[in-house]
């Protein structure tokens, strides 16, 4: 064997004996996938986050709605009070020649007649005979009457079959507020004179006191 053949054989041997480089093993498709419970946790987390956002939005809308409703109610109340106050300040006045006290108008009439005629005269003026509410109201009227010695009919009379004093509006007389002097019998009516409330015959001629409630109507000149 010559030298040329020997070199060729050596090259082939070297090529045959050259180590092979193995390619990296391929990974299975399941190797890169996350565990199943990770995916479930991610889904539930996203759902919970969305639900939380919706709850927050709903609460915000509810709070804004309640606040708006409260503001509207307050504004309506203020407007109503303002209107009522304006009406009271403008229209709540007694007619000319009538006295104003609390929520009533009073007038003392100087003509004399029976209790029935006095009540009828008050009715023609849109009023009634005096209904005394308490001692303070009685003191106000007594201070306003100049003729202390005269008697004035009030809206109180003795009724049958109740056998009791009653005001003309149907309420029962309260003896803790007023004390009535004099004889009481059928046909008795009450009058005030000085600081006393006296029982008299309803046919007696006395002066009288009328009263009417304050209202929202334009004051008139009742005579």
Swiss-Prot record:
MF-aspect GO terms: carbohydrate binding; identical protein binding; signaling receptor activity
Quaternary structure, from the entry: Homodimer; disulfide-linked. Interacts with tyrosine kinase LCK. Binds PTPN6/SHP-1 in a phosphorylation-dependent manner.
Natural source organism: Mus musculus (Mouse)
Residues crossing the lipid bilayer are 44-63
Tissue specificity, in the record's words, reads: Expressed in NK cells and a subset of T-cells.
The opening ranks of the lineage are: Eukaryota, Metazoa, Chordata, Craniata, Vertebrata
Checking Pfam families in the record gives: Lectin_C (PF00059)
Q: Which InterPro entries match?
A: C-type_lectin-like (IPR001304), C-type_lectin-like/link_sf (IPR016186), CTDL_fold (IPR016187), KLR_subfamily_B (IPR051527), NKR-like_CTLD (IPR033992)
Its keywords, alphabetically, are: Disulfide bond, Lectin, Membrane, Receptor, Signal-anchor, Transmembrane, Transmembrane helix
Side Cytoplasmic, residues: 1-43
Notes concerning its domains: Contains 1 copy of a cytoplasmic motif that is referred to as the immunoreceptor tyrosine-based inhibitor motif (ITIM). The phosphorylated ITIM motif can bind the SH2 domain of several SH2-containing phosphatases leading to down-regulation of cell activation.
Name the chain's protein.
Killer cell lectin-like receptor subfamily B member 1B allele A
| Extracellular-side segments | 64-223
The UniProt record lists the C-type lectin domain at 93-212
Q: In the UniProt record, does the keyword Transport occur?
A: no
SMART domains per UniProt: CLECT (SM00034)
Gene Ontology biological process terms in this record: negative regulation of natural killer cell mediated cytotoxicity
Task: Note the topology in the membrane.
Answer: Single-pass type II membrane protein
Give a yes or no for keyword Signal in this entry.
Answer: no
Disulfide bond sites = 122-210, 189-202
Motif mapping: LCK-binding motif = 32-35
Motif ITIM motif positions after renumbering to this chain: 6-11
Entry GO CC:
external side of plasma membrane; plasma membrane
Instruction: Name where it mostly resides.
Output: membrane
Chain's role? Receptor for CLEC2D/OCIL. Ligand-binding contributes to inhibition of cytotoxic natural killer (NK) cells. May mediate MHC class I-independent 'missing-self' recognition of allografts, tumor cells and virus-infected cells.
